[in-house]
From Swiss-Prot:
<comment type="subunit">
    <text>The HisPMQJ complex is composed of two ATP-binding proteins (HisP), two transmembrane proteins (HisM and HisQ) and a solute-binding protein (HisJ). The HisPMQ-ArgT complex is composed of two ATP-binding proteins (HisP), two transmembrane proteins (HisM and HisQ) and a solute-binding protein (ArgT).</text>
</comment>
<dbReference type="GO" id="GO:0089718">
    <property type="term" value="P:amino acid import across plasma membrane"/>
</dbReference>
<keyword id="KW-0472">Membrane</keyword>
<protein>
    <recommendedName>
        <fullName>Histidine/lysine/arginine/ornithine transport system permease protein HisM</fullName>
    </recommendedName>
</protein>
<dbReference type="GO" id="GO:0005886">
    <property type="term" value="C:plasma membrane"/>
</dbReference>
<dbReference type="GO" id="GO:0055052">
    <property type="term" value="C:ATP-binding cassette (ABC) transporter complex, substrate-binding subunit-containing"/>
</dbReference>
<dbReference type="GO" id="GO:0006865">
    <property type="term" value="P:amino acid transport"/>
</dbReference>
<feature type="transmembrane region" description="Helical">
    <location>
        <begin position="158"/>
        <end position="178"/>
    </location>
</feature>
<feature type="transmembrane region" description="Helical">
    <location>
        <begin position="105"/>
        <end position="125"/>
    </location>
</feature>
<feature type="topological domain" description="Cytoplasmic">
    <location>
        <begin position="48"/>
        <end position="58"/>
    </location>
</feature>
<feature type="topological domain" description="Periplasmic">
    <location>
        <begin position="179"/>
        <end position="199"/>
    </location>
</feature>
<dbReference type="GO" id="GO:1903810">
    <property type="term" value="P:L-histidine import across plasma membrane"/>
</dbReference>
<feature type="topological domain" description="Periplasmic">
    <location>
        <begin position="1"/>
        <end position="26"/>
    </location>
</feature>
<feature type="topological domain" description="Cytoplasmic">
    <location>
        <begin position="221"/>
        <end position="238"/>
    </location>
</feature>
<dbReference type="Pfam" id="PF00528">
    <property type="entry name" value="BPD_transp_1"/>
</dbReference>
<dbReference type="InterPro" id="IPR010065">
    <property type="entry name" value="AA_ABC_transptr_permease_3TM"/>
</dbReference>
<keyword id="KW-0813">Transport</keyword>
């Protein structure tokens, strides 16, 4: 194990000398997909709870498709399937975009987490106490101001525990990136195994690194929950 760590610590953590690899790419995939997917989900969640069926139905269909199919299949569709379409091959931008395994992986991860996060945020919006909404209306808040000042802040606090689980699941999902030849942590572990024939050591090191990242993320979310959810915890009685 010491020999493997000594020889492969750089590609495991951040670079093989030519490109970013390992933990660096895994974190990059996670951050991009969670940030872009989270921002999109915030707007889609508002539409998801809309009473207008022409707004609500397309969003429901989107979340149904991406939550109802495996992420692995979605990645294969984007990476292997899209490039076979004539419209993709005939359009310069689409041709360049879907030829990149990294682009396809980010797209699949982003849309997948966006679908799940949309439902998390929509459920949180529905859980905002009705009294808060009525009070905002009584003060003459516009719909935009009511969402900005009352509904979304409350909904995001409510959604935080479930959303933290989604982020951890997305970290685990980045391990599928090797399918699109992206040199993430698992891809480097597979390469180490192929070079050394020591699968227990190669994948064991990867597992430890995933655990460390998970621990850091869980700790950050626990700090956030203590800060923003302290007021909703029941007070202790003696």
């Amino acid at each position: 194990m010491i020999e493997i760590l000594h020889e492969y610590w750089k590609p495991l953590l951040w670079t093989d000398g030519y490109r970013f690899t390992g933990v660096a790419i895994t974190l990059w995939l996670l951050i991009l997909s969670v940030v872009i997917g989270g921002v999109l989900a915030l707007f889609l969640a508002i539409g998801r709870v809309s009473s207008n069926k022409y707004i609500q139905f397309p969003i429901w269909l989107f979340t149904y498709i991406f939550r109802g199919t495996p992420l692995y299949v979605q990645l294969l569709v984007f990476y292997s399937g899209m490039y076979t379409l004539e419209i993709v091959k005939g359009t310069e931008f689409l041709n360049a975009f879907f030829r990149s395994g990294l682009n396809c992986t980010v797209l699949a991860l982003t849309l997948n987490t966006c679908a799940y996060t949309t439902e998390i945020f929509a459920g949180a919006i529905r859980s905002v106490p009705h009294g808060e909404i009525e009070a905002a209306r009584a003060y003459g808040f516009s719909t935009f101001k009511m969402y900005r000042c009352i509904i979304l802040p409350s909904a995001l606090r409510i959604a935080l525990p479930a959303y933290s689980n989604e982020v951890i699941l997305m970290l685990h999902s980045t391990a599928l990136a090797f399918t699109a030849t992206v040199p993430d942590l698992l891809k480097i572990a597979r390469d180490i195994n192929a070079a050394t024939y020591q699968p227990f050591t190669a994948f064991g090191i990867a597992a430890v690194l995933y655990l460390i990242i998970s621990y850091v993320l869980i700790s950050l979310f626990r700090r956030a929950e203590k800060r923003w959810l302290q007021h909703v915890k029941p007070s202790s009685t003696h």
